[in-house]
Amino acid sequence: MSSAATADLPHVARAANPARYARWTPLSGIAFVVFFVAGVVASSPPSDSASDAKWVASYTGHGNQVGHVLTGVFLILAGLSFVSFVSVLWTRISEASRPAVVNPLPLVTAGVAAACIAAGGVLMAAAAGASLTGSSPVPGPDLLRFSDAGGFTMVGIAGMLAAALCVACLSAQARAAGIFGRKLTILGLVASVVLLASFLFIPIVALLVWLVAASIVLMRSPAGG
């Protein structure tokens, strides 16, 4: 083997590693789905109409408190995963659109959505976390209801409305850049409309479906490796 060819080997290895890494970065979209679902199932607060005693009981005991804390942790991780995925997709769009400048609105709205989801998780976990560490007793039922409702408002309303705008913008940009096909573009636009009703909770499934589909498409695309 010539010395020139040998000298090129480190360069080839360095070039291959980023490509291999880039292939798997879209998994952050699927990670959001995993963390979000885990956050939902980790704890089960009572309904708003449940008795005061049931609310206090739901936050009493090591097992219950750990569950609520895990909900907060998983939602924080979900928020980080969402903004990571959007960054990956937007970067792919920006590279494919050169020399045109791509509007960074999806990055801004993804940051807002991630912050709201994480803040909602903190609100949901705060009471249980304080009690679990022994720094305070279990709060009264009214405060427990407030923290749970406030957490859902941040996640299911503020966070999902920002996510709806993000998905709509990304879908249009990815279609224009040739990254998304017609079907995935339509799925993204439909998901963004459905998310407007996210206060009903079930419509949030539309975001999960879109993230899985978009992640698979990005992993299969040539730019992914």
Predicted feature locations:
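Hydrophobic, aromatic-enriched alpha-helical segments typical of multi-pass transmembrane helices
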Residues: 2-225
